[in-house]
Amino acid sequence: EKYLYKSLREAQLSYENPLDGKTPNPYHNALHGADVFWSARHLTLALRSELRVSLKLNDNPNVIFDISIAALFHDYKHCGVNNYFLIRTKHNLAMRYCDRAVLEHHHASEALRLLDRTKVTENMSYKRRSEFRKRVSSIILATDFVRQNESADKVEHIFAKYLKAVRGNDPKPELHLPSFQDTCLQNVLNLIVECCD
């Protein structure tokens, strides 16, 4: 708990003190991080209670923790410009991340580095830490505007069968859903944070 508080406090300070150390970011700041966090939490809990299928949300507190962390840190250390600008100006970040989802890679990398440094992941097993890092980075990377429709298309396809079964008064519409393996769950989590961002 104290480690999480330390990382959240450091993240808040980072949002308040931008990379250039001069100009506060008027949009990608601590308030935006908190707004996306609360919106994602609300949407996740609403999905959990409204759907007749668990999405692995009911029985897995790790999922709620992971999406919460991803939402809070999705714009961590944002420099106040967009990917296009970074690529066009040949910024070091663009070079580091090969012109692909530059800011999102930066946010994910820096967030995971902070969480490790502040020992948030210290007591996680190797398997859990790996799952955490994969889930959080995937959610943050999905906030890239270039990929905005990717998660939506995947989730729409999955739920089309489910909705058809519900509208057809099928007594067990959940049988038309694939078992919610990690890939499907990940797409739903990605979409939640994309919508909230």
PLM segments and residue spans:
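Acidic/His-rich, divalent-metal-binding segments that scaffold phosphate/diphosphate chemistry
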Residues: 1-101
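Divalent metal-dependent catalytic cores for phosphoryl transfer on phosphate-bearing substrates
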Residues: 55-196
